Amino acid sequence: MAYILTRDRPQNSDEEWRDGWSAYCAYLESVKGQLPNSAYDLATVPWHYDFSDHRSPHDGWLESLIIREPASGARKEIRSAEIVAWLFAAYHDGHIELKYSNVQSYSLASGVTDGSGHGAWLYDEISLSERGRVLHEVEWSRGGLWLIECGDIAYEWVPLESAQTAI
């Protein structure tokens, strides 16, 4: 399901944005009890889509993406995938860390492949997948599209002073 992604707004008009936003908010309210609290909170917190707020991922730049499989069990045979994305925030005063736990599937299309990177994070939607998991769709300014289906998403804002020691 898509409401506010670019493909849903062919004219990129204010009216399309308002209509899509209203439908997206209604959708999120309808799945509130089915999404994990942190995914729902991230999708509905006011600053997420307030592009003047420094914590918003909009216009952030990808600095790193890690895919790992933490293991447990006697032979490390119990595995699950997780993805961690580290963004340089749009106002260059902090970083955003997104942790996707219990990843079931993902597609990380890069878009333009001229060596110039992903560009800026444009729009994203959090929804419920057909399998009842969290689905996060992220559009990038150079045409990339990420689809990550997971158990949950954790968001952390790291002010630049703190970020220097986290790297």
Regions found by a protein language model. Name each.
Residues 1-167:
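Surface-exposed, interaction-prone regions used to assemble/regulate multi-protein complexes
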